[in-house]
Amino acid sequence: MTGLFITLEGPEGAGKSTNRDYLAAQLRAQGVQVLLTREPGGTPLAERIRELLLAPSDEGMSADTELLLVFAARAQHLAEVIRPALARGEVVLCDRFTDATYAYQGGGRGLSHERIAALEQFVQGDLRPDLTLVFDLPVEIGLSRAAARGRLDRFEQEGRAFFDAVRSTYLNRAKAEPARYRLVDAAQSLADVQASLDKLLPELLELQRG
């Protein structure tokens, strides 16, 4: 059985991790084998790269350095976690994947689509998510939620224009490839967001059955 690769995307404060865990519980209740993971991270080495990417520092990080670190972590994550799980026939639920790179390093940092796409092909080959859930909400709501969590990481400290570009990139990618993306209104209450996920569950189960 071939596995199913589902990614959850969205800006800061969109509730991706919480809703990833909820979706996993719903799938497991139907007898589905689910693996939860995240990017950057997912393996001990990739988590160390995550720390480099997120920790505020007195030394600035160039956009190219950031991009290469993201894909270095992704290469390790794919080799050690994602590809083996898919080969076992599991459903992989991943908090962020390459759409986040296009949104943050492309939209936010201004790196070209072509540069990101070249690394995407090099690291991933033909592997792409089967389905991507984009948790969308206004920037000001997301930043307010992120601030309420406490100390901000290096990305969360960016300004409004950065996150406007991140959001626009996500929405444009979803519009360009509607077969792969599902938009979820993350500005709703948690109960309403999870009700939206419940409505998606039959589609996910059908995809998993092939």
Swiss-Prot record:
ATP binds at residues 10-17. One of its GO terms (cellular component) is cytosol. Its EC number is 2.7.4.9. Gene3D superfamilies: P-loop containing nucleotide triphosphate hydrolases. Pfam families: Thymidylate_kin. GO terms for biological process: dTDP biosynthetic process; dTTP biosynthetic process; dUDP biosynthetic process. PANTHER family: THYMIDYLATE KINASE (PTHR10344), UMP-CMP KINASE 2, MITOCHONDRIAL (PTHR10344:SF4). Belongs to the thymidylate kinase family. Phosphorylation of dTMP to form dTDP in both de novo and salvage pathways of dTTP synthesis. This is Thymidylate kinase. It comes from Pseudomonas syringae pv. tomato (strain ATCC BAA-871 / DC3000). The lineage of its organism: Bacteria, Pseudomonadati, Pseudomonadota, Gammaproteobacteria, Pseudomonadales. The gene is tmk.
